[in-house]
Amino acid sequence: MYHAAAGGATIVLAVLRFWILILVASAAPGQALYELSGRISPEGLASVTLFGATKPFSTSTLTDASGRFSFKKLEAATYTVAVFQPGRGEARQTIEVGPSLADAHHRIQLTITLRDADFDPASDRRRHSVTARELAIPESALRDYMDAQHDLEKHDVDAAEKHLEHAVQLAPQFAGAWNTLGTIAYQTRHFPLAELRFRQSLKQDPAAYEPLVNLGGVLVTLHKLDEALEVNVHATMTRPNDALANSQLGMTYFELGLFDSAVKYLERARQLDPAHFSHPQLYLAEIHLRRGEKAEAARVLEDFLQHHPDYPQAEIMRRNIVELRQ
């Protein structure tokens, strides 16, 4: 049995947890735009790509020799930063862009500290190898794919989708285009379509990781839990240090009512990427509340707000934390 405060917090958290799965953030008219000035540590040359975590967007740049990079005219949102360094592979980290982190001129300073364990070396090998199917992709389809990336940088989702659909018409084996189409469908809340597109991407390239982990996510959203468990276990075994795979496996166990296993993988995700856009802290807090562990619930909610200071329901969450501490 829960105390009233804990029970009320459980209801609020359940609502918040539900909405993070389907809410697509959008910029209000006249919303401030931000400049992100970042640095990779240890310093070195790298390519840096910024992906929208909750809506379709991507843009890329290169660092200078000291590891510095910048992105301008960014909307307030959650983003995934993907850093690729030759010889090391790719590492990903979630960042927040918003008023709490910016100065008076809407500039945000960021240092991304990366360890060797953060990089996926397989991504380096993939960039230096080309399959026969990829060699068969015509140049016109590749142009469509690149045009789609430029469309996403301009927030023109409809144009990006049209270019990608044309790309897969020209080259049905174009797994990367199918995966991007799936991501767009997921982020625009067309979940069954996202599932079909991720499956098509995997059909064309069964060894590809991105559509595998993305399929695992949409299966959780669609509550196809038996297959979600199978897919997300596979993803975590393929990349044990991927926060997304660990978080999704934790969510799957949560939905199955296997809370001990859920905590294991949600905590792992939180350690790997404390600001991760899947918000593992909200699931952890709900588990702690169901167990009557009010202090633990308050602790993970405070951790969540530390990494998401501009979260829309932050004030409600702060009141919940005060109640849980009483």
Label for each model-derived stretch:
Residues 77-87:
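A short, solvent-exposed beta-strand micro-motif common in secreted/extracellular proteins
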Residues 141, 175-176, 209-210, 243-244, ...:
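Helix-start (N-cap) detector for alpha-helical repeat units in TPR-like alpha-solenoids
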Residues 146, 180, 214, 248, ...:
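Canonical tetratricopeptide repeat
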Residues 133-176, 180-183, 187-193:
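Alpha-helical segment of the N-proximal tetratricopeptide repeat
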Residues 34, 41-54, 126-128, 142:
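Short, ordered, surface-exposed loop/turn motifs in non-cytosolic proteins
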Residues 54-68:
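Short, acidic Ser/Thr/Gly-rich low-complexity loop/linker segments typical of extracellular
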Residues 153-165, 187-200, 221-234, 256-268, ...:
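Structural signature of tandem alpha-helical TPR/SEL1-like repeats
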Residues 61, 86-109:
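Structured interaction patches on ligand/partner-binding surfaces of diverse proteins
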